[in-house]
């Protein structure tokens, strides 16, 4: 009897140690530069607007990381959208969403450190690193591109939602109440990373195991940040019942928390899977209204 318990404990300890080591391999799945795919990506971008409206550059963070960044200017508007992608791939895989967002405003896209052509290593990467990346982009958009903060929308997908939320809250904390992004659009967010881990293990009937492991994933606690969000920033959350990566309940639970304290918020049910969400008419019309009200 005691021997079996000892074996189980040893297995649990091994799993926990393995997860500590492998955590970043699970959480971050960057794709590096693929010349052919990047060539096709830039060729597609060139069809959106004139060449002089597309600017490709590398922005240096305070800790000397170079972030691969693209600015696609929409000359019909003085608004812009900063796009925060999810935990996998790189910006060359995001043409469709860039094309969609370009209908409404100029679009700034970038790869986090270690993703795509950006420098750095994901092995030691953490939430603070991505926060630094996001703030570097924000500062460039404000100081170099000269966009008014109230004319900037933050658009996040998956893990990028948490990065966008963190940036919006940091802006709210560090500046006066008149300095805030116009809107925050979150596609498939999670309530918190630890809650998501618990949810996954609960569905596998391993709730106690999930409770222990959730303590290893204490980053990206969006639920703790939301109360500090500027009340003037409009928030839209969209999630699909068919999302196989981040459960629908995660996004809806986050919306419920936001709606309790934030009047400028809306939840939209979308279709499709996590990486191929279907955007219904309600979503498209809501974004059109959001940007037209700017």
Swiss-Prot record:
Protein name, entry field: Uncharacterized protein R595
Membrane-spanning parts: 5-25
Predominant location: membrane
Disulphide linkage map: none
Residue positions with a glycan: 151, 170, 205, 271
Compartments reported by the entry: Membrane
Topological type in the membrane: Single-pass membrane protein
Keywords, ordered alphabetically: Glycoprotein, Membrane, Transmembrane, Transmembrane helix
Pfam annotation, one family: Hydrolase_4
Gene Ontology CC terms: membrane
Domain of life of the source: Viruses
Keyword Translocase: no
């Amino acid at each position: 009897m005691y021997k079996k318990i000892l074996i189980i404990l040893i297995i649990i300890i091994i799993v926990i140690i393995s997860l500590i080591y492998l955590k970043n391999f699970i959480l971050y799945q960057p794709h590096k530069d693929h010349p052919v795919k990047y060539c096709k990506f830039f060729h597609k971008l060139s069809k959106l607007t004139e060449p002089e409206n597309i600017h490709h550059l590398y922005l240096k963070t305070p800790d000397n990381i170079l972030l691969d960044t693209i600015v696609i200017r929409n000359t019909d508007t003085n608004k812009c959208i900063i796009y925060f992608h999810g935990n996998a791939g790189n910006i060359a895989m995001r043409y469709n969403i860039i094309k969609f967002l370009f209908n409404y405003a100029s679009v700034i896209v970038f790869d986090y450190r270690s993703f795509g052509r950006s420098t750095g290593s994901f092995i030691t990467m953490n939430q603070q690193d991505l926060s630094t990346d996001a703030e570097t982009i924000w500062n460039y958009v404000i100081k170099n591109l000269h966009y008014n903060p109230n004319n900037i929308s933050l658009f996040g997908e998956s893990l990028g939602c948490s990065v966008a939320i963190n940036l919006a809250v940091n802006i709210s904390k560090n500046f006066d109440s008149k300095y805030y992004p116009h809107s925050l659009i979150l596609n498939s967010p999670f309530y918190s990373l630890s809650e998501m881990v618990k949810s996954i293990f609960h569905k596998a009937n391993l709730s106690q195991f999930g409770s222990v492991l959730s303590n290893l994933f204490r980053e990206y606690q969006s639920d703790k940040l939301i109360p500090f969000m500027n009340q003037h920033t409009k928030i839209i959350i969209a999630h699909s019942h068919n999302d196989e990566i981040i459960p629908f309940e995660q996004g809806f639970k986050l919306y419920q928390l936001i709606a309790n304290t934030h009047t400028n918020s809306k939840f939209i049910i979308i279709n499709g899977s996590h990486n191929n969400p279907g955007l219904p008419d309600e979503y498209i019309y809501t974004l059109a209204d959001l940007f037209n009200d700017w």
